Amino acid sequence: MLAYILRRLLLMIPTILGIMAVSFAIVQFVPGGPVERAISQLQGADQSSTAQFGGGGGQIGSGGAQAGGDITSRYRGSQGLDPKFIKELEKQYGFDKPALERFWILVRDYSTFNFGKSYYRDVPVLELIKEKLPVSISLGMWMTLLSYAISIPLGVRKAVKDGSRFDTVTSALVIFGYAIPSFLFAVLLVVLFCGGSFWQIFPLRGLTSDNFADLSWPQKILDYLWHIALPVAALVLGSFATSTLLTKNSFLDEIKKAYVQTARMKGLTERRVLYGHVFRNAMLIVIAGFPGAFIGAFFTGSLLIEQVFSLDGLGYLSYDSLIQRDYPVVLANLYIFALIGLVVNLISDLTYTWIDPRIDFETREV
């Protein structure tokens, strides 16, 4: 098992490099980089009207020099500005070097989690991520744990009661939850419980109260749960349907197999059959969906929830940075997302062996 883990960890290196290379290459062709933005602000032009004719950050090609022409012609709106000032802008934002050299500098710095400074916030990117990460982790972990805590028992019950009235009624509820996205549940919960039109029970903004630092530990826990209750409820209502149906179908497939009939013929109780024999086999496919559920909630699923409940998390930071073309923050977020995703997938694979010891990764190719 140790050899398998080491192989997987080593394979993460080219995967991360590939993700970084693709992300870096895409950024090179996105118009309206930081140099153009600085120029447009100096010229009093609207930021959205800026464009570039070549590489990222307002750079044509990969080098810092333009063949046969004045340097200011690289950037729309740069006419009238001192070429030396344009060079200083390029140096400030790191675009005075060839693209390939910038990429290897990026790889070197990211290997030590040195993400540089945000272009527009003037703070280290790592500090921004540390500040926003707890919010996204809280939403992702609570949503995933509660969603699976509801969907697994419900899916097992639906499989046992397949075709009954209970199965029919819960199927309607599951389909309803699947059809409506989480952010609509969030808006509904705000209207109902945050003083929109009915009750003022839960807070509308933030993850903690203003006087959080002055509270005792029990009060801090209650305050945190009070703030996070509705965002997590909205995420769970919009996400438990898939894992519920997956659990039900997986159990139905296993229940029909011969070993289940043999266990029943031996006189084992139904509970012993379900949780002593069927559960381990049926849960493999459910566990396989755990990384996707967590990553989805962690990165994309919580973006609109963060907007509705005014939670300053990593999802909103990524969106805002992409809109502002704050490339250090965008690339750092992609790097963190990819790294966490790969680690969670590895943990998911290792969980297979805990659920079913018959699985041996040592004898299989990665």
Give residue ranges: language-model regions.
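Short, membrane-interfacial amphipathic segments enriched in basic
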Residues: 1-3, 96-101, 112-126, 162, ...
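Membrane-embedded alpha-helical segments of multi-pass transporters/permeases
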Residues: 16, 20, 24-29, 183, ...
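Membrane-water interface segments at the C-terminal ends of transmembrane alpha-helices
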Residues: 26-29, 173-206, 234-236, 240
